[in-house]
């Protein structure tokens, strides 16, 4: 029995419509902080911006799309967001 041909999903750069989801503590200015950090590293499409709070209000999720240029850029974005101390997860 042969194994199915499974291709890994690689991102082709540049990717003009790369979705980013940032989850963090609900604090005043969280959305603006996310936009500021992302804008330092990539072109941000603010038309795709969505913000949502968790049921209990403890966490906030900010979603938007960026122009992703490279794996290094995505790594730098992740590092910069995590360095804020209020970001819990970047997807």
UniProtKB/Swiss-Prot annotation:
Belongs to the UPF0250 family. The lineage of its organism: Bacteria, Pseudomonadati, Pseudomonadota, Gammaproteobacteria, Pseudomonadales. One of its GO terms (cellular component) is cytosol. It comes from the Bacteria. InterPro entries: UPF0250_YbeD-like, YbeD-like_sf. This is UPF0250 protein PputW619_0619. Pfam families: DUF493 (PF04359). PANTHER family: UPF0250 PROTEIN YBED. SUPFAM superfamilies: YbeD/HP0495-like.
């Amino acid at each position: 029995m042969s194994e199915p041909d499974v291709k890994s999903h690689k991102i082709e750069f540049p990717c003009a419509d790369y979705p980013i989801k940032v989850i963090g503590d609900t604090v005043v200015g969280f959305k603006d902080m996310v936009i500021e950090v992302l804008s330092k590293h990539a072109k941000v499409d603010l038309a795709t911006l969505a913000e949502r709070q968790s049921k209990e209000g403890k966490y906030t999720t900010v979603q938007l799309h960026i122009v992703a240029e490279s794996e290094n850029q995505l790594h730098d974005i992740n590092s910069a967001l995590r360095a804020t101390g209020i970001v819990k997860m970047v997807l």
